[in-house]
Amino acid sequence: MLSLETLDLLLAITEGELIEEMIIGMLAAPQLSIFFKKFPAIRRALDRDLPRWKLQLKERLHEAMVPPALAQEFYRYQQCQLENNTQFFHNLNDTLDLLRQLVSPFYEQARSLVDAADLPNHPLDDSFQTLFLQRWRISLTLQATMMHHQLLEQEREQLMAELQERLALSGALEPLLSENDTAAGRLWDMSKGHLQRGDYQRLVEYGNFLQQQPELKKLAQQLGRSYQAKAVQQQDALPEPFRVMVQVPATLPEEVSGIHQSDDILRLLPPELVTLGIEELEFEFYRRLLEKRLLSYRLQGDVWQEQIHIRQVTHQQQDQQPRGPFIVCVDTSGSMGGFNEQCAKAFCLALLRIALADNRRCYIMLFANQIVHYELTAASGIEQAVRFLGQHFRGGTDLAACLNATVSKMTESGWFDADAVIISDFIAQRLPEEIIKKVKQQQQNHQQRFHAVAMSNYGKPGIMRIFDHIWRFDTGLKSRLMRRWRR
C-alpha cells in the first residue's frame, strides 16, 4: 500500500499551504468573526492552539493511504521514467490499456497525445516521451491534490463541529471564569470535553448567583489574592564589603597649633631658612633636613573619609510567598444545605476563577462520611465542576478526616506551597490533638497557610483557633437582610 505522505514526497507536493488555506477559510466564517470580536481573549487562546491543529492535520494526511487504482497508476508512471526510448514506445499500448482499465483521468489526454503525434509516420525521439511523462505527472499531482482536498474537507467538517461546541462553551463561561488571557487560554484548553448546553448551564446559574452576592465574591478575591512574605535566612555567611566613615587628619590642614621638628620645607620657620643662605651652615641644614629636625609650623585639621572593610554578613530577607494551588474542603453536612450550600459552591467557583487567572490549581474535597475529590483545573475540569455543583449536601460532619486528608495532600509533590481553605459552619466536634499537631507542624515547618471560611457566627472557637485566618460570611437571615439593605 502506498501512503499519501510517500506520494507527496515523490511528487514534491507540500500539504502545508493546503492546510493553511483550509484553516484560514474556516476561521473567516462570518459567525466566527462576530464571535471573536465579542470575545477577543478566546481568539488569542485559539491562535495559540493553531500550531497543534496544523500538526494534527498534517499527521492525519500522512497516515492516509492512497487508493489502489491511483497507487497502481503511480507505480506504472515510475516504471516509464526508468525506461529508455525504445522500451517506452514498445510498452506504450500496454500503458494506455492500463490507464483505461484504471479509469484514470489522464487516459483521454494520453490518447490525444498519441493520436496527435502520428507515431507510425514519424521517427521515434525523446521529445514525445518527455512531454507524455510531464503531462502524466501533472495529472498525478492533480489527483493527489484532489485527494488532499477531500480529506481536508472531511477534517474541516469535524473540526468545525468541535470548534463550534468549544466556542459555545467558552463563550458561555468566559464572563464567569475568564479574568485575563491566561484564564481564557486555560478555559479554552478545558473546553475539549463533550458537554451539552444543559450540562454547563449549572455553572452559569451559580455564576449569576455569585454576581448577586458581591460580598461573597469580594471575600473570595481577598482570600485568593492574599499573600505574606517569608523570612528566609541564608545558610552560609559570605564575606561582603562594609563601608564606614572615619575621621582622619587632613592632607592639607589649615590651623596652626605649634612648632615641631620635621622635614616639611613649605612650613619651615624663617630662622631655619636663614641657615640655608650661610655657606658655613649649609651642610648643617641638609643634615638636619635628612634627620627631620628642622623647626617647622605644626598644622592640624580632620576630614571624614570612607573606608571599606570586609566582614562576614548573614542576610535575612523577606521573599514574597508564591501563590500556590488551592485545596478547598467543603462541609457537606445537613446544616450546610440550602443557602449555605449555594454560597459554598459559588465561593468555590470564585476561587476557580482566581486559579485560572493566576495559573494555579484548584482541588476540591467534599467531607462528610466519605471524602470526594474534584480537581477543577484539570483537563476535564469543567466536567468535574458540573459534577461538583450537582452534589447535594446531606452528609455528616467529619472535619478531622478532612484536615487529615488535606495535610496528606499538602505533602505530595506539586502541593508543597498550597493554601488550604475550609468552608464550613464549624458546628462540629472538637479536633483530635494529633490533627492539631499535624496542622501546626505544616504551618511552622513549611509555612503553609490554613484558611477558614465560616458560614455561621456560631462556629466553635476552639476548632477555628488552628487557622491562620478566619474569613466570616454569616448566612443567617439577619445578616442576609443587612447585606441587601447596604446595597
UniProtKB/Swiss-Prot annotation:
It is found in: Cytoplasm. Keywords: Chaperone, Cytoplasm. The keyword Chaperone applies. PANTHER family: PROTEIN VIAA. Component of the RavA-ViaA chaperone complex, which may act on the membrane to optimize the function of some of the respiratory chains. ViaA stimulates the ATPase activity of RavA. Belongs to the ViaA family. Homodimer. Interacts with RavA. This is Regulatory protein ViaA. It comes from Serratia proteamaculans (strain 568).
